[in-house]
Each structure stands twice: as structure tokens, then as C-alpha cells.
Amino acid sequence: MQGFSKKVQDVNNYSKVKGDLFIRLLNKKKHEKALENAVYKEVDGIACVLYMKVGQRDGCISSMKIHKASLADWGMDEDEAYENALANTYFLTPPRIYKWECLLFNPNYEGDDFMDMNYEENIVERNAGSCLSTSIRTNGAVAVFLPNVAQRIADLMDDDFYIVFTSVHEAMIHPKRIHWL
């Protein structure tokens, strides 16, 4: 991977950075000042922000927000850049459903690829609920905003659902028709 400073210098060259663009969530109200020049879409107070990965080491990612000024250099509008980064996020860190009890007792548990059309497990009947994240379990709360994810969860549950953002790394999924609440 290119060095940090080289990546930052290339930020205005879309062809060089497009594979490193992804979406990360921030609380819009809490990060209002930092979002002034950033590229993002708001969903109910959550800012889905365009970032660029500038480095990675020992499983940790260094990144920077993309500013609106970069879009002019890229020759694209916010919607196009956002949609491209959203798709890229999906492929870089695919969404996964984790059985809560497996997460607690098995550190090597990799979750279920519920987006696979052959996946048919009932995610409603889990006593502890289902945890939505990504394949790397980092910044996984973004998974619900990835293409077709919310619809797939609703289809698997055969119901609407509640989502509880427990951190930026995951969200708990519960069917609307929970009987034990």
C-alpha cells in the first residue's frame, strides 16, 4: 500500500483513490462542526460520511473524511460519489449477521452471510437477538445502510424490525413482533 502522505496527495485523483473509499457513520449533532465540508448523507440524525482509507496496520484502519472540494476534481456529484463508496463498503466489508451467543463464546466466529440467497435461517427465533455488523466487525453499524441489507433482513424475518445501534461497530436487530418485550 502507498505511504500515508502519498495517499493524501492523491485524494483529488478519483482513479487512484476510488478503491479506498467507504462509508462510516457519525452522530450528526455531535460532529456538526467536523461535517461542515464533508461529503455525507443524513438518515435520521446519523451522518453516513464518505471516507478514504489512507493506511492499515495490524487490522486497524487509518482514514480521512472526503471534503466536498474533492468532488469537483473528481468530476462527480455527491450522490454519485456516495453511491460508489456505499457499494465499495459492501464489497470491502460485507454485512454479516452474528448470533449473539456465538459472539460471546467463540472469538473466531465469523458470522453468517445472510445476503447469500441460499441463506434461510430464521433470525427471528434467537433468544438473545441478532447482531448486525460487517465481516471485520469494525464500523459495522453501517451495514444496515448498505444496498439491499434492510430489505433482506425484513424478508428473512417476514416482518418489519427494530434496529438498536449499540456502537459504531454493530447494531442489534429485533423483529417488530417481539413477544417478550
Per-region residue spans from a language model:
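Extended, low-hydrophobicity segments enriched in charged/polar residues
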Residues: 1-124, 128
